[in-house]
């Protein structure tokens, strides 16, 4: 978006990425100070918005998801995908954080290196459970997928701690679409939402990148190359190409036997947690990432997360995987 002043064109921050509960010049209670929120959200979204507008004239007309999908297969438009993905990830993660009743981070002493040696207390009572906010369906799905809420919480936090730079930890729902349901004589698509997963993405990666077709193609290539290499190492150089073809056939057969045949799989994001030091360094310091994540947990608005859980989820399917 451009605003003209005299002969100069000044880029104005687009409010299309604004979140109602985040106010510039105000803190996010219990999670970010005024300065912390400015650096974690406002400065970054303004920068990314300006960069995206510099790359394409469609940034103000199309949703971020559309920009990501339409440009993801073009190497020359990778920069558009990166900026759009980064904006999407940042907005998605902040949209679920409503703050908490903890002491403001700027009023707490900075943690030192001893924080790295702290052992998590697995006997502690979990605060901010989805059940306590009336989100029974989400809590049931979490327990069915991860065993218990404590296991889910531990995996979520530890997964984020494992990211040393920019990235996000996601809670996603796996959606399976039966290709046969796309025939003209079967107008109602058979969509199944069978399980929840936690995954990490790095830099500008998004859950949209995790599709069964892409993963299976990559695994297929790896399997074929491995078999081809084995043939070469065994001295059967002339047979290596034939071995590769046989390996591909074997891979396809085994994949079909394991139930992947006829299924398109995608992942629906429900929750994202930002791991970037830009988010937590200002308020929590070098050794405060775990403290930041503990407060993120207490700040999650589970009603928003549950609203993203597909209504057609087959709860009974959670117990079979």
From Swiss-Prot:
Its main location: mitochondrion. Residues 1-13 form a transit peptide. GO terms for molecular function: structural constituent of ribosome. Keywords: Mitochondrion, Ribonucleoprotein, Ribosomal protein, Transit peptide. GO terms for cellular component: cytoplasm; mitochondrial inner membrane; mitochondrial small ribosomal subunit; mitochondrion. The keyword Transit peptide applies. It is found in: Mitochondrion. GO terms for biological process: mitochondrial translation. The keyword Metal-binding does not apply. Present with 2840 molecules/cell in log phase SD medium. Component of the mitochondrial small ribosomal subunit (mt-SSU). Mature yeast 74S mitochondrial ribosomes consist of a small (37S) and a large (54S) subunit. The 37S small subunit contains a 15S ribosomal RNA (15S mt-rRNA) and 34 different proteins. The 54S large subunit contains a 21S rRNA (21S mt-rRNA) and 46 different proteins. mS43 forms a heterodimer with mS42, building a large protuberance adjacent to the mRNA channel exit in the mt-SSU body. Component of the mitochondrial ribosome (mitoribosome), a dedicated translation machinery responsible for the synthesis of mitochondrial genome-encoded proteins, including at least some of the essential transmembrane subunits of the mitochondrial respiratory chain. The mitoribosomes are attached to the mitochondrial inner membrane and translation products are cotranslationally integrated into the membrane. Belongs to the mitochondrion-specific ribosomal protein mS43 family. This is Small ribosomal subunit protein mS43. It comes from Saccharomyces cerevisiae (strain ATCC 204508 / S288c) (Baker's yeast). The gene is MRP1.
């Amino acid at each position: 978006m451009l605003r003209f002043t005299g002969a100069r064109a000044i880029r104005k921050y687009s409010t299309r990425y604004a979140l109602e509960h985040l106010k510039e010049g105000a803190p996010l209670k219990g999670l970010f100070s005024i300065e912390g929120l400015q650096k974690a959200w406002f400065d970054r979204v303004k920068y990314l918005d300006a960069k995206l507008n510099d790359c394409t004239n469609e940034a103000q007309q199309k949703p971020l998801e559309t920009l990501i999908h339409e440009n993801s297969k073009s190497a020359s438009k990778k920069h558009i995908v990166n900026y759009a993905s980064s904006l999407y990830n940042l907005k998605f993660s902040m949209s679920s954080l409503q703050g908490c009743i903890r002491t403001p981070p700027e009023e707490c002493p900075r943690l030192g290196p001893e924080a790295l040696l702290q052992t998590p207390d697995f006997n502690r009572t979990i605060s901010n459970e989805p059940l306590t906010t009336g989100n029974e369906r989400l809590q049931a799905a979490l327990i069915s997928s991860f065993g218990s809420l404590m296991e889910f919480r531990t995996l979520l936090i530890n997964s984020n701690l494992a990211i040393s730079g920019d990235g996000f930890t996601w809670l996603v729902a796996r959606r399976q679409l039966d290709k046969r349901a796309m025939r003209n004589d079967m107008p109602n698509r058979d969509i199944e939402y069978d399980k929840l997963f936690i995954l990490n993405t790095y830099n500008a990666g998004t859950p949209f990148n995790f599709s069964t077709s892409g993963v299976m193609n990559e695994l297929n290539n790896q399997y074929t190359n491995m078999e081809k290499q084995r043939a070469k190492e065994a001295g059967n150089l002339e047979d290596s190409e034939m071995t590769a073809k046989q390996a591909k056939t074997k891979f396809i057969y085994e994949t079909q036997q394991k139930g992947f045949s006829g299924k398109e799989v995608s992942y629906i994001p429900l929750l994202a947690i930002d791991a970037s030091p830009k988010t937590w360094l200002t308020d929590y310091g070098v050794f405060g990432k775990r403290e930041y994540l503990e407060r993120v947990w207490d700040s999650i608005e589970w009603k928003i997360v549950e609203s993203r859980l597909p209504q057609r989820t087959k709860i009974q399917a959670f117990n079979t995987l």
